[in-house]
Amino acid sequence: FNNIILTHVLEHMDDPVYLLGRINEDWISENGRLFLAVPNANAPSRQIAVKMGLIDFNAAVTKSEFDHGHRITYTFDTLERDVKKAGLNIVYRSGVFFKALANFQWDQLLNTDIISKDYLEGCYQLGLQYPELCSSIFLVCEKGK
């Protein structure tokens, strides 16, 4: 395949390195790309949850997340570790959207007029500046040797 996209899939895998290895060895073409996005353990919403005592540490998998199939919560370091273990080469890394609130809080706010388009644009721009603090992190990878 020339392009493989895994968006919020890898955190559901019991053996993510195995899947990434299969992509590298069997599925991705010589000039192909893997686009990989996962939830970010270091998102401010998770860091706040730690400070509130809702979760023990940033990368903790909550009961609700586990019930939805999550097996890991990635940081850039742990995501890059798994990608490199699988033999893939990382060509780009970034984040998607700065988010200080939990999903249920966003859902409630978006049903009001409190959140403006300018605020959303500000969060987007902040995410470009601080990808390590975005709600999701992503890597673009190429086939390794």
Please place each PLM-identified region on the residue numbering.
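A conserved beta-strand element that flanks and buttresses the S-adenosyl-L-methionine
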Residues: 5
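Conserved acidic residues
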Residues: 2
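S-adenosyl-L-methionine-dependent methyltransferase catalytic module, highlighting the catalytic core
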Residues: 14-26, 33-144
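A short His-aromatic
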Residues: 8-12
